[in-house]
């Protein structure tokens, strides 16, 4: 279904409402930028990687339910190829971290879940069909992680890897480890680590998405009517127009900064505003309306209202899908691997109340090796923030390096 004009108008109205509601929490202000066009606006991921002097590969993998996913790989850094490079799997992106890890000697894989701009194909279904988009992050947990991790290990001839997740990439791994012991054993090694940034439940979300939840999400049918039952806000529609005609101009920079603030959290002054046009031409990366409903919690028993991480709620049809009235819960207390958490109080999509009130108490204490609370970060700063390299990526690299040393010298 084509994005309805009413949904665009409603999006604009909600932006105004959100702006008014969060002004007490965030000062929205313009940042001077250059009008120069950045060529990365029209590049795909491999082209951007090549532009910075790194090799890039595209790898297709078919899931058990026949979705065709595309991973991106940086097999080595500027030092050139070498054998037996440890594998690190990034879900999703984490911007410049891919180059930091490649230069540090890692074989870097960038995952793309179904519905993402690079993972919208199927052996049988037409990507334009409603059937193709009939998924939420449940299917990513069940099928996509298996397919991508297995392929990365196979290609690199390794038996284990390091996983670094952000946002949905963290939530899906937590869910996978809680549910699938075979997968857990498959990737487990003596010092297994999952390094996670910016994710939890979304009961205490703030900003524009909170407004959407309050105003729209009591009626599933209305939400589907508004946005369709296929792809949620196609990537090359609204946001590309904003990037092309607004973010490049000095006058429009404030609008783009404010839009990020209203969604992601208080402006931390970490974003390089000269790259706003690049950021907005590559977001949103694409997903289904059903996945947004799962995240935003349309039904009263979904995550926003309950604060519990569970599978998609089909309402009266739960009995049909699950054989029970309530959807199954992802019990993260079953996760049994070393976990390194990086989070921040100003992240409106992974709120402090959700992190400290649900996630940390739910995880077993012996597995939470490091719990890092960052100040003056918001949700998007983990990817694009100018302090992310020093305060997030390098500590992650240090943790992995220490682990590799312990594997080489088990008595250390």
Where are these regions (language model features)?
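Cleavable N-terminal signal peptides of Sec/SRP-targeted secreted and luminal proteins
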Residues: 2-20
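Alpha/beta-hydrolase-fold enzymes
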Residues: 21-24, 154-159, 170-314, 319
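Short, surface-exposed "cap/lid" segments of acyl-processing enzymes
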Residues: 48, 63, 68-125
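Alpha/beta-hydrolase active-site loop
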Residues: 130-155
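Gly/Ala-rich beta-loop-alpha elbow adjacent to hydrolase catalytic centers
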Residues: 164-169
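Short beta-strand/loop motif that positions the catalytic acidic residue
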Residues: 335, 341-343, 347
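Conserved alpha/beta-hydrolase "acid-adjacent" motif
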Residues: 348-354
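Catalytic active-site module of serine/aspartate enzymes centered on a nucleophile-bearing elbow/loop
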Residues: 367-412
């Amino acid at each position: 279904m084509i994005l309805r004009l009413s949904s665009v108008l409603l999006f604009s109205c909600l932006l105004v409402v959100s702006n008014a509601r969060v002004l007490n929490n965030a000062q929205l202000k313009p940042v001077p930028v250059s009008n120069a066009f950045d060529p990365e606006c029209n590049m795909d991921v491999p082209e951007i990687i090549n532009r910075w002097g790194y090799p890039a590969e595209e790898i297709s993998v078919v899931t058990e339910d026949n979705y065709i996913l595309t991973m991106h790989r940086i097999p080595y850094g500027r030092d050139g190829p070498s054998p037996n490079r440890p594998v690190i799997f990034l879900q999703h992106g984490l911007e410049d971290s891919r180059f930091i890890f490649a230069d540090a000697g890692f074989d870097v894989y960038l995952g793309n879940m179904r519905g993402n701009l690079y993972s919208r194909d199927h052996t049988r279904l037409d990507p334009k069909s409603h059937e193709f988009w009939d998924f939420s992050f449940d299917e990513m947990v069940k099928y996509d992680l298996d397919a991508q991790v297995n392929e990365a290990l196979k290609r690199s001839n390794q038996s284990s890897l390091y996983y670094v997740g952000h946002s949905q990439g963290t939530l899906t791994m937590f869910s996978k480890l809680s549910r699938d012991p075979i997968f857990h054993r498959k990737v487990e090694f003596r010092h297994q680590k999952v390094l996670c940034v910016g994710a939890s439940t979304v009961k205490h979300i703030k900003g524009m998405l909170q407004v959407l939840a309050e105003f729209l999400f009591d009626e599933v049918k209305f939400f589907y009517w508004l946005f369709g039952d296929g792809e949620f806000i196609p990537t090359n529609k609204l946001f590309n127009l904003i990037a092309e005609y607004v973010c490049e101009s000095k006058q429009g920079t404030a609008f783009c900064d404010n839009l990020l603030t209203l969604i992601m959290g208080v402006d931390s002054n970490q974003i390089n505003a000269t790259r706003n046009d690049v950021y907005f031409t590559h977001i949103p990366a694409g997903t289904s309306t059903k996945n947004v409903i799962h995240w935003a919690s349309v039904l009263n028993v979904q995550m926003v209202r309950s604060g519990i991480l569970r599978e998609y709620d089909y309402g009266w049809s739960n009995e049909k899908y699950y054989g029970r009235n309530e959807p199954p819960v992802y019990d993260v207390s079953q996760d049994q691997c070393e976990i390194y958490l990086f989070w921040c109080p100003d992240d409106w999509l992974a709120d402090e109340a959700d992190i400290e009130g649900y996630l940390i108490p739910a995880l077993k204490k012996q597995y939470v090796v490091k719990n890092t609370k960052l100040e003056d970060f918001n949700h998007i700063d983990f990817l694009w923030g100018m302090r992310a390299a020093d305060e997030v990526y390098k500590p992650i690299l240090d943790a992995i390096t220490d682990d590799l040393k312990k594997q080489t010298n088990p008595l250390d």
